[in-house]
Amino acid sequence: MGKKYLTISNNLCINCVKPLSAKNEKIKKGLMQQHTEENVEQQIAELTAQVEALTASAGVTNTNFAEAYYYLSIPLMLIIHAGFLAYEMGASRAKNVLSSGVKNILAFAFMIPTFYFFGWWVYWGFPTGLTLSEGPMGISGAAYASSIAWGWGDSAAFMGPNITDQASGVFFGAFAMFAATTASIMSGAVIERIQTVGFVILAIVLGSFAWVVAAAWGWHADGWLVTQWGVHDFGAAGLVHAVAGFFALGVLMHLGPRIGKFNADGSANHIAGHNMPLTITGLMLIIVGFWGFLMACVIIPGEAWSWFADKQSTIYGTPITLSSLAFNILMAIAGGIIGAWIWTKDPFWMMSGALAGIISTASGLDIYYPALAFIIAVSAGVILKPAATWLENRGIDDAVGAVTVHGTIGLYGVIMLGVFGWGYPALAIENAPVITLYGQIVGAVVFFLLGFVPGYVCAYILKALGMLRVPAAVEEAGLDTVKVPAQGYPEGIAPSGPASS
């Protein structure tokens, strides 16, 4: 009985073990699956956190790089002013050398506060025209400008110390240097006879208003010249150089030539500067500084300002690389020098040809193939001196050729892009207008008017008020003798020899 019971019990136990084992296995598998799913979810959460951390780190890196990039462009552009300083002082006669230098330094000094107080606001307020309304991209108009570009009120955080803002100061700084460069272009044309106060007023009008309106219209994603006409001017050939050059022309028409420049029959006399090597050195410094100018025309990924999250672009949002920019700038400099040397053999115009090469290709440096940039620059170097002679034959005394180098060649560069860049998107948006010859001509005309009209009108007013030109006796004696309480060469001998009258 006991044995049978044991047998039956054993049989029952054996029969029970199988279903129990299967059930346990199922439970075990379920637990393992649940554990695996939990591990996967945990791993996904950890990976997501790592990706977010890396993305945030990359964003900080991009922002820091962009901040450093524009910060570096500011002192590089300041080299332009060192160049203009040497350029104008060398082109002046010894009796006017310090006056020319002081004037150029004052142009820079007055640009910074005036651009801070109203020039920056003009850039963001005026893109759609004189209506001060918001444009299609939503980054323009009076309300928007007041929110980010006013030195007080709601936008004060963008225009002053703010530890969380790594964009506003360096971006403003780069644009302020564009403004100062624009004013300095006009400075050289009027040396040796303009009143300092009158010059400062003209510099403020040009650097903190006239060119800024041109930039708002043609160098802004909401600019009406861009959105309606497809105007493209990457390196500011028109909106900086042409505006400044033709502003200078308007001023020169009222300022008049230096005493002794023209004879009674209208023929011109050459008035040599006191130090050609200094002038040539200044031109080379300007060329060095323009690397900073053009690098600041590139939009680097960063907070608030970039079109793309991961790559640089033009101010229009179209793609560009620093590599392509380097190719084209170098070819343009070389082409301009070669073209001017072939035509003139004159060291002054040869170095001016380097500037002409950069300016003539500036509008399309983001588009041109290097060989094309070289050809355009050579042609600009060739036409440089004949264009200056044509202007001189009409009674305009431009002491350094600023109207020709910046004005004429600036418009030439804008129009050349219409010829060679036709069909290329002008703006990085859907249904964007394309670059056309007629669009670029419209832009060129607008840039001419934005320069010439304010220059002509302001000079007319200053002349009527007796604030434009120094008296003839002061001019003949030398501005350093009468207007500046110092002399560049107190021994009376300039490096190149006796000062000429």
Which residues does each predicted region cover?
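Hydrophobic alpha-helical transmembrane bundles of multi-pass membrane proteins
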Residues: Q33-S501
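Short, positively charged and aromatic/hydrophobic N-terminal segments
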Residues: T7, N11-K28
